[in-house]
Amino acid sequence: MAIDQPIKKRGRPPGSKNTKNKMEQKMELVHQRLALLDSSSGSDRDDDIGPRAIIIDCDEDDTDDVMEVVPLKMLMPKEVENEQRTVPGIPQTCNTQNTSNGRTNTTEVPVKGQNKCASYLPKKSSVQAFCGSAMKRAQEIQTKLPAEHPSFVKHMLHSHVVSGFWLGLPAGFCNKYLPKHDTDIVLEDENGNNHNTNYLGGKQGLSAGWRGFAINHDIKVGDVVVFELVSTTKFKVHIIRDKNISPTDRAPGLKSFYACKKRKISKEATDNATKPKEDPETTRVSSKVAHDDTQNLVHEAIDGIRFSDSEMSFDDVMSYSNFNIVVDGLVIDCKFPDHQRRTYYELCCAQKSFLHRHLLRQLSLTLVVGVIMETINIAEGIRACGAGTSSQEDFLIWKKTLQSFDLLGMNVAFLLKRVDDILGLPEQPRDPSECSKYNELKLERSRAGEKVKALESMMLTVKDVLKKIDAEMEEMESSVRNHDIALRKIATAPW
């Protein structure tokens, strides 16, 4: 039974630890249930749904009246957006907001088990005040687009830009204007830069490439995006920011970083509470520098990975200094040692293209890095192969690995051909001692060597004999010459 009177806030005696502990447990339970509702609301098809919010009013503390607002996206069809949803275990009331005086009139609806907290679901006017500004501006932009360019408006959800990085498109729009098969669709931003994405005709949504586009353009939950179809496979994208989102929340994946920074800043503020105030001019300059650093964090390297400034063709690579390994809009040079990156640069130069350019979409970044790295290792192994360093089994493993990479879209045909050429060489035993003929020839050579040694020994003996004979002959010839000389001397003596 409804009672037309404000909810009476109840207090507890100060210092009641038991009560506070119970209250903390109940609040944890409430947040868990709200998180479950939030996780179940991330549907890709959100064309006819609108965000809601739940406000938890908890009056349990000893002296302070606390109103805690817990944002929650409860996706409800427009046909029933004025109807009230029931959150299990949380009391429900209907909340009507008075815009003239800023007060809120609340009608309480008793729910079984009600004791501590009240939950409110704002009506449509409150929802529009919460997140309708961006949608309204998007619709205004859509009305000003050329009539010959079909368009649609998309409200960004958690599953679009945070967890899934998958963007489902309106079925009616896809059936009427987009191809039925898988194809590449170009997204042109407001600066005229083009970004390639993969459109899945069967699922009617953008997959690979949308992640890099969303991160690079700081698209956040609550933003509204207008897609203007300017050609068969090209959208011009207009991004309308949700003014309720702080600049620090613009960087996907950095929430925990900012939370940590916030806690650190709060601690420093407490420690410096007694310090004298700084000069106002210095404070303004420091604030500006901090703001610039916050904005630059979006484009800083996360674990060494940074965003590519533009789509790069291999024709633009003039030298190793401007060679980058880009996958899905992310520069992943940091994943490779310098010598491996140089080897990959040489391989790409030999083929005059990026070897990974045609890899299948939706491959994980870890898998892509592994494929490129193993390709580099195989190329280095082929270069270093020799008769005693690489076996037949090594080449067979490399061949199977390269064949699997080829199926994934990696350009490794030239490496496969090189491996096939090596495998096509006549097979020879690695160790000649394993060949029987070699052993026979070795034994025969040994025997021939022994014969040579025996003959050489005989030759030495013969040479000695020849020397002795020569000496004796010389002695005999000398004796004959001496006798002839003596004879001629006597015969020719004077009378």
Swiss-Prot record:
Gene3D superfamilies: DNA-binding pseudobarrel domain. Residues 92-108 have a biased composition (Polar residues). It holds the Pfam family B3. The keyword Lyase does not apply. It is found in: Nucleus. GO terms for molecular function: DNA binding. One of its GO terms (cellular component) is nucleus. CDD domains: B3_DNA. Keywords: DNA-binding, Nucleus, Transcription, Transcription regulation. InterPro entries: B3_DNA-bd (IPR003340), DNA-bd_pseudobarrel_sf (IPR015300), REM16-like (IPR044837). PROSITE patterns: B3 (PS50863). Residues 152-243 bind DNA. Signal peptide: none annotated. Residues 1-25, 88-108, 268-289 are annotated as: Disordered. Residues 268-282 have a biased composition (Basic and acidic residues). This is B3 domain-containing protein Os01g0234100. The lineage of its organism: Eukaryota, Viridiplantae, Streptophyta, Embryophyta, Tracheophyta.
